[in-house]
C-alpha cells in the first residue's frame, strides 16, 4: 500500500516537472541522459534527483523537499524488503497526510518560458511590449535561467547582424530582467565589456557599452573600461571648446558616466564641462544675442555637477582660479550668472573649509564685487 501510494505521488511530481520546464530540470540536475519525456524519468532519474530537481525549479518548496525524502525512506523501510515489518496505521496516515499536503494538493506550477522560444518571439514585431507581462515572465525564473537569459540577450544585442526589431525588443525587456539579477551576475555580465575591448572591434565594443548604459550599470565597469570610454571623450571636449557640435556630442555621452569619472581625468573633465557651460561672448547677424554656448550640452551639465564629489569640487575651484577665459567672461553679468548656477548645484556638498570660500562668495549675489576682486 505504501509503495503504491508513494508511486502515485512520484507520478504527480513528474507531471508537474514536465509542466514547469523539463529543460530547466535538465540544467539543474545535469543527468547522465537528457530527460525528454515521462518515460525518461522512469529510466534515468532516481527519486533523490527527482525531488531535488523539483525543489530547484520551484515545483515544491524547501519543507516539501525534506518531507518527501522522509516519505521515500519510510517507503523503503516498510515496503522495500521482503522481511520488512508492517508500519503502524499512524505512520501510514502521517505519510499520506504529508504527501497530500505538500504534493498532491499543490496546484500545477506556472510554466517557465523557454529561452530559445522567447528569443524567437523577441524577433517578431508582434512581441507584446507590455511591462506587466514581461515582468511576470521573468519574475518566476530561477537564477540559472535569469543568468543564461541576460547573457544571451547581451551577446545578441552586440552582434553586428542583429535585426533592428530584435534589438529594440531587447532594449525593452533587458532593464526589467536586470532588476531581478543578483549583484554577482551583474558584475560578470558587465565585465564582458573588457573582453570585447581586447578583441578590437570598435562597433561591437560600443554596442557593449550601450547595453551597459541601457540597464543603468555603468557603475560596474572596470577601471580599464572606464579609461577606454572616457579618456578620449574628455580629451576631445577639452580640446574643442566653443565647437558646439563637438561639445554637444561629447557632453551627452559623458553625462551617462558622470558618477564614475576616473580620478586621473577629473581635472580635465571639470575644466572642460565648466568652460562648455559658460560658453563665449560674441556677435551674430542671425541672432540678437551676445551670450553663446552649446545648447544641448548646457542642458546636461547642471545634472552632471549634481554628481560631483569632493575631488571634483576642488577641481572646479581650481578651474575658476586659473582659467583666464573664465576670469574674462564672468565680468559679463550673464556669464557670471551661469557660473553661479553651477556653484548652486554643489552648494549642499560644500563644507566650512576655507578653500571653499570662493564658491560661497560666488553663490551670494550680494558679494559679486568681492568675488570678482578675488579672481584678480
Residue spans for each PLM region:
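Charge-enriched, short contiguous segments at helix-coil
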Residues: 56-115
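"Short basic amphipathic alpha-helical interaction patches in structured regions
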Residues: 3-7, 22-23, 89-94
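Flexible secondary-structure boundary motifs
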Residues: 16-69, 73-74
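Short, hydrophobic, well-ordered secondary-structure elements
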Residues: 1-19
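Non-catalytic all-alpha helical scaffold/repeat segments
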Residues: 115-376
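Eukaryote-specific, cytoplasm-facing alpha-helical/coiled-coil scaffolding segments in long proteins
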Residues: 16, 34-39, 79, 100-107, ...
Amino acid at each position: 500500500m505504501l509503495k503504491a501510494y508513494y508511486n502515485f505521488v512520484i507520478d504527480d511530481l513528474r507531471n508537474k516537472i514536465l509542466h514547469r520546464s523539463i529543460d530547466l530540470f535538465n540544467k539543474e540536475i545535469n543527468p547522465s541522459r537528457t530527460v525528454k519525456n515521462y518515460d525518461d524519468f522512469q529510466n534515468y532519474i532516481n527519486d533523490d534527483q527527482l525531488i531535488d530537481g523539483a525543489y530547484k525549479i520551484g515545483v515544491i518548496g524547501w519543507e516539501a523537499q525534506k518531507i518527501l525524502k522522509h516519505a521515500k525512506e519510510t517507503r523503503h523501510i516498510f515496503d522495500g524488503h521482503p522481511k520488512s515489518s508492517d508500519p503502524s496505521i499512524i505512520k501510514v496516515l502521517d505519510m499520506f497526510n504529508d504527501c497530500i499536503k505538500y504534493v498532491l494538493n499543490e496546484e500545477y506550477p506556472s510554466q517557465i518560458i523557454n529561452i530559445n522560444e522567447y528569443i524567437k518571439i523577441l524577433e517578431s514585431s508582434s512581441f507584446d511590449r507590455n511591462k506587466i507581462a514581461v515582468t511576470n515572465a521573468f519574475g518566476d525564473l530561477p537564477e540559472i535561467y535569469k543568468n543564461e537569459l541576460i547573457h544571451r540577450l547581451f551577446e545578441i544585442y552586440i552582434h553586428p547582424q542583429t535585426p533592428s526589431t530584435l534589438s529594440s525588443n531587447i532594449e525593452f525587456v533587458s532593464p526589467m530582467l536586470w532588476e531581478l539579477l543578483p549583484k554577482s551576475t551583474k558584475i560578470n555580465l558587465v565585465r564582458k565589456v573588457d573582453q570585447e575591448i581586447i578583441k578590437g572591434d570598435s562597433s561591437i565594443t560600443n554596442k557593449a557599452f550601450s547595453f551597459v548604459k541601457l540597464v543603468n550599470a555603468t557603475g560596474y565597469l572596470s577601471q580599464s573600461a572606464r579609461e577606454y570610454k572616457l579618456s578620449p571623450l574628455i580629451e576631445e571636449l577639452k580640446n574643442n571648446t566653443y565647437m558646439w557640435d563637438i561639445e554637444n556630442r561629447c557632453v551627452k555621452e559623458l553625462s551617462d558616466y558622470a558618477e564614475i569619472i576616473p580620478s586621473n581625468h577629473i581635472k580635465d573633465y571639470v575644466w572642460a564641462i565648466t568652460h562648455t557651460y559658460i560658453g563665449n561672448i560674441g556677435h551674430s547677424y542671425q541672432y540678437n544675442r551676445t551670450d553663446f554656448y552649446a545648447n544641448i550640452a548646457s542642458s546636461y551639465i547642471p545634472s552632471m555637477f549634481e554628481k560631483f564629489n569632493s575631488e571634483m569640487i576642488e577641481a572646479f575651484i581650481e578651474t575658476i582660479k586659473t582659467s583666464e577665459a573664465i576670469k574674462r567672461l564672468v565680468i559679463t553679468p550673464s556669464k557670471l550668472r551661469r557660473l553661479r548656477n553651477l556653484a548652486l548645484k554643489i552648494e549642499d556638498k560644500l563644507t566650512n573649509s576655507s578653500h571653499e570660500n570662493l564658491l560661497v562668495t560666488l553663490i551670494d549675489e550680494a558679494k559679486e564685487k568681492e568675488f570678482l576682486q578675488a579672481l584678480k
